[in-house]
Structure formats: C-alpha cells, structure tokens
C-alpha cells in the first residue's frame, strides 16, 4: 500500500456561540489562523512551523501547541482577539525528530503527545506524554515502537471520564501490527503492556481509534490480503455480551486506501469515512457497529485533501461526536465531505464566492467602460476637421 503522506492537516473549531475558526500551515510553513464566519480575518501566528495541534476547552477558550524550526515548543491560548504565547521548552531538533504533536484537554488537565526518534536510529520511536495539572508538568514514556524510517501517525481519544486511549502500528519481526494502550486518569498511569489488535502474519497499518458517546472503543486499520489491503474493524464494548472484550466485526469489502479510515458519530449513528479513487465514501451503522451499509459517497473536488482535526461545541454531545473530518480548504474557506452540520459555512462560502464574482464583474465592467470611452474618444478625434498647413480647417468627405 502506498501511504498518502501528501494529505495535509488542519484544525477546525466551532465554539458554543457558533463562531468558527481554522488553523493550518500554508505552503511557506506559516501557521495561519482564520476567523471564518466572523469577519473572515486571517493572521499569521508564527513562521517556520514544523508541527502543530489545537483544541478548545469547555469555557470556549482556544488552545494551541506548535513546534518551530528553532526547536521551541510553544503553548498558546486565545483571548481578546490575540494569541498569548508561552514557551514550554526547547527540543533538540538537531539530534532528534519530532512528529505528530497532539494536544488534548480534559477539564483543567492539559495533555501533550508526540513521537520522537534519534536521527541516528530512525527505526526506534518513542511516544511521550506530557501532563500539566495546575502548575506541574509531568512526562510519561508511553511506549517504544520499532518501525521503518517513516512512522504511521498514532491516534488518541478519551472517554467522558478523561481516560485516554491510544492506537499505533509498529513492526514486529517482518510485519507491522496494530497496538492499543490505555491511560487511567484516576491513578495517572499507562497500561504497562500494549494489547495487540491485529494478526502477526500480515502487515497492518494506518490505525484509527474512536470512543463513542457510550464509551465504547472502536479501532479501524488496513490489513494486507493477497496483494490488497482490506479495512478491518474491532470494538471494545462497555456493555452487552462482549463487555470488556475486543470483538472483530466484518465490514463490506473495502480495499486499498492510502489514507486513514475515520469513524465518527452523528445522531447516535456511527459513520466510517474513507477515501478511495478520488471519492469519499460514508458507511453507516444503526446498531452501534454490528452491521454497516454504504449511505453515500461524494467526489473529491479539490486537492490536496485535508484531514481536519475537528471540534464543535455547538453539537449535542449526547448524540454527536466527531474528532476528524475529511475536508477541502480553498482561499481560507473550508468545507467538509459527507457533511450535514455546516449550513452556515456553506452559506458563507456561497456568499464569499458571490462577492468575489461581483468584484470580478465590477472590474470587468470598469475595464469595459474604460475601453468604450477610449474608443469613443479615438473615433471623435478621427472625425474632427483637419487643419491645412496654414492652420485653416478643411472639411472631409
């Protein structure tokens, strides 16, 4: 499977007042912040950015974490139309690589995650977890991962109590496997040993984890099968016959993707989104993941495709939960595939497009009027009586 590392990442945040914000890196590695449906203003937060992550807390405060090319790990909060920056520390980017910054907040606890490896040995990666409670920072080594020089992204999620769940893929002997780990928020400890989710006899890559509104844990990944890659799915339930056991559930045949399949919950129905052959497909389950049907699909209209870190405080948390969406960003406008939550964004994008068209038409009319005026002046000059050498006007026929 050819992994699509060209997919770009961004962050979309909607607060409880329906104000929408977007953060993303441009082609010059500037970190941009847009207030989408407020005044459509855009600002550069910082330049030469290596990686970033952002979120919002229950009090509508935006939080941002980013690493720049000077090795500065900077933590920011947004208030009074400004980002307030604090230097957490300096990372040794000359000797080490740092990837997949992830910021997670539960109540007053700040969680920071990243993967790191020494540039001399990029086959051994470590996931580290930094926790802040009040004024104290504490670092945990979550796990070590054997991999090739490129490491698949890890993903995390949390339940309503603040327990954290993590999934990653690592190399065991000659094959890649998918592993799961759990952080207990009450004793502040990670499980000592990861749980293997996949088979050891084939390659398993691109894992994704999702915790639904009922605190059930779901993992998606791709598994090699006779030259193809099939989407696999397991669920860890907190209730029912399979309580506290991992159960594999059969999906319709979904082959060879080069990007992560995503899971989300809308109207208490689980959805699986995946990209394939220039289209986004949407599978739906009405029975908590036991069975799945294809509900719709839509063409990818703009490239690159964006994997959007998604937060929306305006949604009913008892019925909806979305961590990521696939989307499109065009001139500071954002849209989401297989989406029915953002009529305000659609209206704003349509209004913006109409405004731009109006401006273009106005410019065209101004140019046309200028050309017509110039043509009239030239015609008038050509029809005016000419003077002879003595300065007398002569009539032309």
Task: Please describe what each predicted stretch is.
Residues 1-397:
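Extracellular, repeat-based ectodomains that mediate carbohydrate processing or recognition
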């Amino acid at each position: 499977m050819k992994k699509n590392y060209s997919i770009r990442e961004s962050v979309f945040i909607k607060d409880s007042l329906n104000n929408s914000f977007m953060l993303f890196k441009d082609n010059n590695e500037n970190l941009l912040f847009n207030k989408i449906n407020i005044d459509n203003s855009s600002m550069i937060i910082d330049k030469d950015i290596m990686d970033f992550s952002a979120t919002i807390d229950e009090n509508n405060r935006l939080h941002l974490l980013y690493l720049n090319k000077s090795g500065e790990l900077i933590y920011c909060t947004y208030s009074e139309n400004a980002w307030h920056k604090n230097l957490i520390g300096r990372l040794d980017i000359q000797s080490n690589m740092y990837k997949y910054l992830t910021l997670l907040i539960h109540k007053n606890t700040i969680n920071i995650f990243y993967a790191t490896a020494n540039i001399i040995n990029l086959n051994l990666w470590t996931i580290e977890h930094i926790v802040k409670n009040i004024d104290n920072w504490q670092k945990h080594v979550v796990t070590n991962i054997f991999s090739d020089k490129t490491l698949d992204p890890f993903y995390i999620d949390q339940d309503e109590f603040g327990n954290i769940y993590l999934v990653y893929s690592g190399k065991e002997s000659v094959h890649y496997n998918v592993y799961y780990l759990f952080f207990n928020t009450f004793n502040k400890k990670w499980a000592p040993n990861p749980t293997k989710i996949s088979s050891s006899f084939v390659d398993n890559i691109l894992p994704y984890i999702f915790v639904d509104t009922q605190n059930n844990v779901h993992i998606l990944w791709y598994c090699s099968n006779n030259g193809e890659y099939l989407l696999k799915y397991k669920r860890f339930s907190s209730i029912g016959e399979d309580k506290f056991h991992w159960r594999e559930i059969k999906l319709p045949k979904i082959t060879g993707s080069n990007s992560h399949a995503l899971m989300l919950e809308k109207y208490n129905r689980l959805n699986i989104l995946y990209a394939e052959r220039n289209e986004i497909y949407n599978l739906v389950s009405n029975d908590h993941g036991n069975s799945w049907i294809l509900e719709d699909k839509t063409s990818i209209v703009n490239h690159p495709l964006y994997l959007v870190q998604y937060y929306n405080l305006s949604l009913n948390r008892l019925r909806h939960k979305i961590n990521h969406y696939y989307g499109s960003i065009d001139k500071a406008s954002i849209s989401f595939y297989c989406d029915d939550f953002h009529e305000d964004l659609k209206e704003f994008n349509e209004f913006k497009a109409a405004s731009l068209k109006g401006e273009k038409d106005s410019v065209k009319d101004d140019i046309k009027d200028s050309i017509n005026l110039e043509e009239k002046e030239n015609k008038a000059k050509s029809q005016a009586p000419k003077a002879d050498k003595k300065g007398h006007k002569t009539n032309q026929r």
